[in-house]
């Protein structure tokens, strides 16, 4: 079994104590004791009990969000060192370091593919496990990330391959690779995963996929690999943050998540008669609520779209747009190169192009939403004459026109591939009807509200 012993799930006195931000607890018995030592002691007792029910049974302890109680042991090395041999350590491979790349200024949380890994925390835990002659296991994402649950996989094959090679080099004995353990989608990154597990040398896996799925010759294979590399390199500039992933909700909200279904809000007090699908709760809400509570939650649900610029935190508006434009520019170059190779190469090739096109559309929506709200706020908050006022209106209308075109181009993509927007983990993210509703809303803003 797997038990999360950090800040959720398997509760103990240090899980999330009230009014404590530094690892203390309000439990009179545990007050003043070492959180790492006490949590290790509890896990050891559970592991011993598990073994009594069958010596073949294994227990994996996962310190997910343990930063809540590990301020004095930030890499949880003391906790690892206190574990009995009956306990196996499983930890996040890519989390909790500060991004030192182009998108610097944020700390990696949960799962991403910007950081290949291992993180400092995982590397230190792995080193401690080696000292104790114990295996170390990891929890990673191997095909997509939380901000992109609208796709079965992110088409960044070299980044996924580098992650798997890094896991091998770090000595990872095994891993769980899907959010909520949802299973496999038969995606190219998952094939890389299988080959990395079962083949001693999986370095030619991408070439195999190109020849088999796209029926390419040697030159075509090399061109495809080069195009994929451009896409993988573009992701260095993706403005990764909790706000991009889901704004104040943390996950599953905002312009990158909803992409071509995300509206452009001019009047923040107007719901624009958008259908209920724009306010649906995330799919796991039913797991912790009774039917009556769920109905109440749904009635009070906030929109899944956003109407302000909090999404640009902590970068600030100008830096956010700079990163986004760099990411988009490189992505478009890779997309065009891939399109020149794969167009007309069969169903699998067309599906790959559709996935790449979808990311391009979501990045374009993200930029348009940020630019629209920036221009809207200038219009609403800065005095100007009538001529300047008209120019500002025209800027907003131009952005709306571009976003309408962006959404319209996604309709045939959605028609061709039901995986896009499906949301296999938490329920539908968006569909063609939501995109059409968004297009109608943007036309209303452009053609009626702004004039």
Please identify what each model-predicted range represents.
Residues 30-451:
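Substrate-binding groove of N-acetylhexosamine-processing glycoside hydrolases
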Residues 1-32, 242:
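Active-site groove signature of glycoside hydrolases
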């Amino acid at each position: 079994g797997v038990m999360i012993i950090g800040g959720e799930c398997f509760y103990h006195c240090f899980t999330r104590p009230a009014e404590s931000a530094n690892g203390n607890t309000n439990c009179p018995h545990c007050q003043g004791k070492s959180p790492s030592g006490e949590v290790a002691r509890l896990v050891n007792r559970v592991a011993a009990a598990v073994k009594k029910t069958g010596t073949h049974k294994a227990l994996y302890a996962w310190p997910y969000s343990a930063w809540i109680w590990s301020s004095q042991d930030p890499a949880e090395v003391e906790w690892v060192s206190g574990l009995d041999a009956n306990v196996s350590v499983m930890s996040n491979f890519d989390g909790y370091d500060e991004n030192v790349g182009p998108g610097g200024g944020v700390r990696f949380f949960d799962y991403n593919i910007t950081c290949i890994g291992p993180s400092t925390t995982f590397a230190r835990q792995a080193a401690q496990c080696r000292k104790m002659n114990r295996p170390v296991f990891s929890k990673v994402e191997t095909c997509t990330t939380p901000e992109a649950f609208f796709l079965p996989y992110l088409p960044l094959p070299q980044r996924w391959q580098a992650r798997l090679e890094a896991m091998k080099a770090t000595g990872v004995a095994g891993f769980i690779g899907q959010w909520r353990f949802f299973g496999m989608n038969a995606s190219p990154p998952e094939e890389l995963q299988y080959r990395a597990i079962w083949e001693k040398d999986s370095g030619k896996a991408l070439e195999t996929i190109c020849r088999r799925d796209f029926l390419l010759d040697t030159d075509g294979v090399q061109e495809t690999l080069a195009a994929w590399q451009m896409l993988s390199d573009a992701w260095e500039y993706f403005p990764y943050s909790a706000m991009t992933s889901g704004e104040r909700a943390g996950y599953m909200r905002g312009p990158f998540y909803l992409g071509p279904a995300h509206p452009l809000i001019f009047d923040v007090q107007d719901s624009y008669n958008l259908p209920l699908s724009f306010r649906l709760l995330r799919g796991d809400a039913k797991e912790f609520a009774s039917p009556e509570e769920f109905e109440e939650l749904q009635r009070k649900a906030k929109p899944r779209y956003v109407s302000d610029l909090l999404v640009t935190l902590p970068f600030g508006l100008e830096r956010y747009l700079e990163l986004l434009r760099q990411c988009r520019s490189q992505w478009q170059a890779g997309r065009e190169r891939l399109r020149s190779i794969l167009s007309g190469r069969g169903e699998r090739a067309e599906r790959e192009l559709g996935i790449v096109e979808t990311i391009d559309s979501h990045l374009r929506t993200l930029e348009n939403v940020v630019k629209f709200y920036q221009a809207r706020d200038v219009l609403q908050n800065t005095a100007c004459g009538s001529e300047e006022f008209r120019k500002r209106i025209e800027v907003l209308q131009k952005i709306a026109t571009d976003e309408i075109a962006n959404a319209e181009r996604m309709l045939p993509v959605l028609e061709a591939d039901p995986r896009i927007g499906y949301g296999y983990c938490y329920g539908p993210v968006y569909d063609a009807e939501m995109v059409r509703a968004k297009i109608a809303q943007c036309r209303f803003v452009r053609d009626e509200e702004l004039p």
